[in-house]
Design a protein with these regions (language model features):
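Alpha-helical transmembrane-bundle signature of multi-pass membrane transport and export proteins
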Residues: 1-438, 465
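Long, low-complexity, intrinsically disordered segments
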Residues: 221, 431-467
């Protein structure tokens, strides 16, 4: 007699967790604050200098620090309690942003302050991403991640617009002070709304120079075939967000103005915001894993259709369909969490996020330069084509990862639970400690994943809602 399957997790279940509600609200405040600061500083620098180049440099200063933060600061969230890291990052950012509002601060100092404030976003995000599996175990984590990803996307779109409106209504310095208050509120929510947890890594993990620790993090992410494939699948977003980078020239070639540009941007944001929660709610964990590669390729193939030079209405459909296919990023995120050991997770997340931000900025610049030579539609189609080809290659790589490993003699490995793992262990990525190979001929190396299993047999991870 078999036990009845556990009911599927719901968004109501996710929001019923007080710690997640506090974390989610802090995400809204932090993301909105980041957008507001970028807009306010860009406006302030331009008002001071009347230089478009310096204004662009000031805006770019909000992205470049992710390189330093991702490589050298993200592992703080492994070596220190993650709640403490988040609260500290919010406090530091509040002070730095408030300092920007001081009258008479030189332009160079403003850019440096923004650079420093944004640099602390990386350890904050690494800590937030790493603590979430402990708050939302099993399949609840996938739903919670969908909520947070959608929130970030919405905050990016509305935050920039709200930032412009705030600067117009209140002025630059009051807007910066509002931004500082959002970070204070975020820190209070996390400090009061989440419980204390010890550091994930042992004290000895902090030994070594920052360069040595960064190199170890890169080896962790790119030395493992599964992690390497997952990170590259995540980085494919660089090709698929090109329409956002050249939305204005694309709309102009269609005879549209600011309204058409806004529609292009809104279509991608809205489609992603709708598709991601639906993908997490109605597609099973195992199916998500198998759909990652095909959906990534479908996103690129869809964008290739812009080579046909469609009108605005058809273009919006194309961009929406491509963005909806990008919901596969949720599966990438969840599989990444399962694969990375908990005591290295924050550093791994920092490196993965750093790559996305840096590559996306470079892709926007390259797409803009290419659009000076060929039509924007051709640039988008080329980016989609390249992304589709890479996605197909990564799909085959992922299938090799998913294939069951064979023991000597050709027999598939058999994994069984040695005992029921606690829910928090299941979510921490260390559940392999509770699994053993009953064939005993060969042991797999410690990987922190239950992805390798014999055909037709669910692992204990899958039975608990994790991929």
């Amino acid at each position: 007699m078999t036990a009845a399957p556990a009911p599927r997790a719901t968004f109501r279940d996710v929001f019923a967790v007080p710690e997640f509600r506090a974390l989610w609200t802090s995400v809204i405040l932090s993301a909105a604050g980041d957008r507001l600061a970028l807009v306010a500083i860009a406006v302030l620098v331009y008002d001071r200098t009347r230089s478009p180049l310096l204004a662009a440099v000031a805006y770019a200063a909000g992205y470049l620090p992710w390189v330093i933060g991702g490589l050298f600061l993200a592992d703080l969230a492994d070596r220190r309690p993650r709640r403490t890291v988040m609260v500290t990052c919010d406090a530091v950012r509040a002070v730095l942003v408030a300092a920007m509002a001081v009258p008479g601060v030189p332009v160079a100092a403003l850019v440096l302050l923004l650079f420093a404030a944004t640099m602390f976003a990386s350890p904050f995000e690494a800590a937030r991403a790493s603590i979430t599996p402990g708050i939302l175990p099993g399949e609840h984590y996938a739903l919670g991640t969908a909520v947070i990803q959608t929130t970030y996307l919405t905050a990016e779109v509305t935050g920039a617009a709200a930032g412009g409106a705030a600067v117009t209504c209140f002025g630059v310095r009051p807007s910066l002070l509002i931004d500082a208050v959002t970070f204070v509120a975020s820190g209070l929510l996390i400090g009061l709304g989440t419980r204390a947890r010890p550091a994930a890594a042992a004290p000895a993990a902090g030994q070594g120079s920052p360069l040595a620790r960064a190199a170890a993090g890169l080896r962790l992410v790119f030395g493992d075939r599964a992690l390497r494939t997952l990170v590259l699948l995540g980085w494919l977003v660089v090709f698929y967000t090109i329409p956002q980078g050249i939305a204005a020239p694309y709309a102009a070639r269609l005879g549209g103005g600011p309204v058409a540009t806004g529609l292009v941007l809104a279509s991608t944001a809205a489609a992603t915001a709708i598709a991601t929660p639906l993908f997490s709610r109605f597609v099973s964990p195992r199916r998500r894993l198998t759909l990652m590669g095909p959906l990534a390729a479908a996103t690129g193939v869809t964008l290739v259709l812009t080579a046909l030079r469609p009108g605005l209405a058809v273009s919006l459909v194309i961009f929406s369909a491509a963005a909806a296919s990008g919901a596969y990023q949720l599966a990438v995120n969840t599989a990444f969490v399962v694969r990375v050991p908990d005591d290295r997770r924050a550093q791994a997340f920092g490196i993965a996020s750093m790559g996305v931000v840096v590559a996306q900025g470079a892709a926007f610049v390259a797409a803009g330069a290419a659009a000076e030579v060929v039509t924007p539609a051709s640039v988008i189609a080329a980016g989609g084509g390249i992304g589709a080809v890479v996605a197909v290659a990564l799909t085959f790589c992922w299938r090799r990862v998913m294939s069951p490993r064979r023991l000597p003699g050709g027999r598939p490995a058999r994994w069984e639970p040695a005992g029921p793992p606690p829910a928090e262990v299941m979510a921490s990525g260390s559940a392999d400690e509770y699994l053993r190979d009953f064939t005993a001929e060969e042991r797999y190396p410690r990987t922190g994943t239950g992805l390798l299993t014999r055909p037709g047999r669910e692992t204990v991870l899958e039975r608990n809602g994790l991929p």
